[in-house]
Regions:
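Intrinsically disordered, low-complexity regions enriched in polar/acidic and amide residues
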Residues: 2, 6-9, 104, 149, ...
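ABC family nucleotide-binding domain
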Residues: 17-241
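C-terminal boundary and immediately downstream tail of ABC-type ATPase nucleotide-binding domains
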Residues: 2-3, 229-231, 238, 242-261
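Pre-NBD coupling/linker segments of ABC/ABC-like ATPases
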Residues: 1-16, 253
Length: 261
């Protein structure tokens, strides 16, 4: 398989929509030192689809998904989120960021604010919601992720898994069309991983469009519509979970899986 064939966006399965919410075409990115971290990556993500991105350290996977909300700029190619081009127009970038939620390895919660205030801050300032509406939605979301009883505590009083669930609720409070997850369980103790993955599973069942950088193979097998392998700044292979894990086409994919399975 050639690189261009490997990177040709695949059509979604019948279970997801036909509307592409994310359209990335031939995306290139260089760092200031000249390092080419993304080398012409193309990927479509469809409404309601869950795409898991895997790859070794330094493969460009986290950088790639961070271009989807302009946390990382790119120099060539194009990225559209729900029809809005991410370019240099600050209004377009702000519009995209309102529609794209992101959860990181670290929780990035404000330590001096309660859980409830962490979740309501952005909707009040960015969406201009009144306090009562923001708090009502926040409590509903905290209940959804299983920590409504922690609403008046501070982040430092919570476990890592609880803090990550607050971070997910905070992103959902903006009512995004897309959720990005950048290795959301990698900083957690093993016994806390499941509670975060359960929240992500429920989001997928509810039809949230999701792009997840993770090496949680069980989650990918169960929840993903497609699994993508990146290495060296290129998309090596993308396929259904069954084909990706049981019958990978590329030698690089086979070698990678031999190290994590």
């Amino acid at each position: 398989m050639t690189q261009s064939e490997a990177q040709a966006p695949q059509a979604p399965r019948d279970a997801v929509g036909s509307e592409a919410v994310i359209v990335a075409k031939d995306v290139h990115k260089w760092y200031d030192n000249g390092f080419n971290v993304l080398k012409g990556v193309s990927l479509n993500v469809y409404k309601g689809e869950v795409v898991v991105v895997m790859g070794p350290s330094g493969s460009g996977k986290s950088t790639f998904i961070r271009t989807f909300n302009a946390l990382e700029p790119y120099q060539e190619g194009s990225i559209e989120i729900d029809g809005t081009l991410i370019g240099y127009d600050i209004k377009d970038i702000e519009a995209v960021r309102r529609e794209v939620g992101m959860v990181f390895q670290q929780f990035n919660l404000f330590p001096h604010l309660t859980v409830l205030k962490n979740v309501t801050l952005a909707p009040q300032w960015v969406r201009r919601w009144p306090k009562a509406k923001a708090e009502e939605i926040a409590m509903r979301l905290l209940d959804r992720v299983g920590i409504a009883e922690q609403a008046n505590k501070f982040p430092g009083q919570l476990s890592g898994g609880q803090q990550q669930r607050v971070a997910i609720a905070r992103s959902l409070a903006m009512q995004p069309k897309v959720m990005l997850f950048d290795e959301p369980t990698s900083a957690l103790d093993p016994e806390m991983v499941r509670e975060v993955l359960d929240v992500m599973r429920n989001l997928a069942k509810d039809g949230m469009t999701m792009v997840c950088v993770t090496h949680e193979v069980g989650f990918a097998r169960e929840v993903a519509d497609r699994v993508v392998l990146m290495d060296g700044g290129v998309l090596v292979e993308e396929n259904t979970p069954e084909a990706f894990f049981n019958n990978p086409k590329e030698e690089r994919t086979q070698a990678f899986l031999s190290q994590i399975l």
